[in-house]
């Protein structure tokens, strides 16, 4: 299907500053209504008024560029158990019939002590970050800005979860259990080299092949290069999402769709870097409490067969391991 920037696809820009100033005001209710409309139509919206400083954002982009410029053997040593550290180029694919994704990544999160039983049992995303040697990439140029940005994004994520909770009829504490127990919240730096034009034309090479996000909520910061496309489920068109330096692209993932019985959407999207230069993005994922069971929110507190309901960890392991094992056919 062709790529379009004009479509009925609903991708609003929502300024949340009125909600932050007074969540009970008329202006805040308009914000809540706009977010609800986005959640029920496409699951995508652009977030403005978030309070994350441009200087902090740029420091993370600069850190990413420095890391990905390191020699391959150095990057490859920055790997750890629990989906932390370096993700090599072309190591992942979400689709059959295409080449492996033309991207590399670096994943960080909250450091969990090595003597924690969850680390010893190698539970999903439980472990230590895998930083590059400080003599090759000083902490001031990489680790510190990443850690500062991570804390800022964690706070913003709680705001977004509270805002989504306000769009639902289950009260302000509906996600409290979801957020407990050191929730898995991966921060992923991504580098997309320019894609070879012939392979792009054949539909064989993408930076990130078509997929829905696995978790509950995604907060995406794009650089000034285009590449993100979302599929209109009604027409099949791919809709380009132009970069906006002031906005985060927020989208709901499969978990949120699941617990709302599909009322809130998790849309298919992809990345193709057809620019002549490298593209970078920084993505914060809220995957949640590993032991949380993904039951419908309208059944919370009622009788429900818990044994037949996947936990967050079971869901994430199933989806994540699959994407690293797909082969081109």
From Swiss-Prot:
It is an enzyme of class 1 (oxidoreductase). Fe cation binds at residues 211, 213, 269. The lineage of its organism: Eukaryota, Fungi, Dikarya, Ascomycota, Pezizomycotina. GO terms for biological process: small molecule biosynthetic process. PANTHER family: 2-OXOGLUTARATE (2OG) AND FE(II)-DEPENDENT OXYGENASE SUPERFAMILY PROTEIN-RELATED. SUPFAM superfamilies: Clavaminate synthase-like. It comes from Monascus ruber. Binds 1 Fe(2+) ion per subunit. This is 2-oxoglutarate-dependent dioxygenase citB. Its EC number is 1.14.-.-. GO terms for molecular function: dioxygenase activity; metal ion binding.
